[in-house]
Amino acid sequence: MSGGKPRSNTRTVAMLAGVVVLMGALSWAAVPFYSWFCKVTGFAGTTNVAEAASDTVLDEKIRVRFDANADSNLGWTFRPMQREMELKIGENAIAFYEAINNTDEPVTGTASYNVAPDAAGYFFNKIECFCFTEQTLQPGERVEMPVSFFVDADLVNDRDAGRIRDITLSYTFHRTDPPAPKQAALDAKTEPTVN
């Protein structure tokens, strides 16, 4: 009987170690898998990237609203240059966003984006976008940043998205470079202390 227990304990330890390794591997793979899943399905408002404008333009119109947000530590003013745009489904359009660096130092940022309602994300195609690369603005610099897009004509045939005629394209700019030592010291002073 005592010969069976060590083998049983060894097997249990090996199985538990395998479970731990499997959980670690799944945790590591979850983020890239979720990103891939969102790009393929348009889940969570993820948009597509198109190589060229659509070949199919319908007579039906759709309204696209534009939204802009900037992370508080960015130091930029960021806003859409038009609140909304009405266009034909499948028609290529260009919208502009304005960014102003209000700091006394160069700041690099990147924009994350989303489309609402989520079901429209799969049909919202960007051809060119400032969100594809990091943007660096010099102190006081003002830029107009374009986004070229279209809403795929297949939207009207989709069971979930077929009735959508209002879409919101939203961007949030985040700082990607570490703040200068002077700014980091100011940020540290303003952070509340927790006891």
UniProtKB/Swiss-Prot annotation:
Protein name, UniProt field: Cytochrome c oxidase assembly protein CtaG
InterPro entries, A to Z: CtaG/Cox11_dom_sf (IPR023471), Cyt_c_oxidase_assmbl_CtaG (IPR007533)
UniProt keyword Cell membrane present: yes
Subcellular location, record wording: Cell inner membrane
Known role: Exerts its effect at some terminal stage of cytochrome c oxidase synthesis, probably by being involved in the insertion of the copper B into subunit I.
Family affiliation: Belongs to the COX11/CtaG family.
Bilayer topology term: Single-pass type II membrane protein
Record field: transmembrane: 8-30
Native source species: Paracoccus denitrificans (strain Pd 1222)
A GO cellular component annotation in the UniProt record: plasma membrane
Molecular-function annotations in GO: copper ion binding
Stretches of the chain found on the membrane's Cytoplasmic side: 1-7
Top-level taxonomic group: Bacteria
Record GO biological process: respiratory chain complex IV assembly
Keyword list, A-Z: Cell inner membrane, Cell membrane, Copper, Membrane, Signal-anchor, Transmembrane, Transmembrane helix
Chain ranges on the Periplasmic side, renumbered to this chain: 31-195
Keyword Magnesium part of the UniProt annotation: no
Pfam families in alphabetical order: CtaG_Cox11 (PF04442)
